[in-house]
């Protein structure tokens, strides 16, 4: 399974949305109905699943699904 699909599955499960809604352009708050606590819990789930650390200052810059995919791609092997 490709990285995007893995991330898509985690996001869909955490936010209780259909995976089809989780597109690279989908914004967590505006499009997927997440509140600030949902976003924090999602970041923690992604950190655990993919073995990356997403510092708060980076998490604040992650607005949509594409942002988180890029961050994990760039930092997963670091």
Swiss-Prot record:
GO terms for biological process: lipid A biosynthetic process. The keyword Kinase does not apply. 4'-phosphopantetheine is transferred from CoA to a specific serine of apo-ACP by AcpS. This modification is essential for activity because fatty acids are bound in thioester linkage to the sulfhydryl of the prosthetic group. Keywords: Cytoplasm, Fatty acid biosynthesis, Fatty acid metabolism, Lipid biosynthesis, Lipid metabolism, Phosphopantetheine, Phosphoprotein. Pathway: Lipid metabolism; fatty acid biosynthesis. One of its GO terms (molecular function) is acyl carrier activity. GO terms for cellular component: cytosol; membrane. It is found in: Cytoplasm. Pfam families: PP-binding. Its main location: cytoplasm. Disulfide bonds: none annotated. The modification O-(pantetheine 4'-phosphoryl)serine is found at residue 36. Residues 1-76 form the Carrier domain. Transmembrane segments: none annotated. Belongs to the acyl carrier protein (ACP) family. NCBIfam families: acyl_carrier, PRK00982.1-2, PRK00982.1-4, PRK00982.1-5. PANTHER family: ACYL CARRIER PROTEIN, CARRIER DOMAIN-CONTAINING PROTEIN. Carrier of the growing fatty acid chain in fatty acid biosynthesis. This is Acyl carrier protein. It comes from Helicobacter pylori (strain G27). The lineage of its organism: Bacteria, Pseudomonadati, Campylobacterota, Epsilonproteobacteria, Campylobacterales. The gene is acpP.
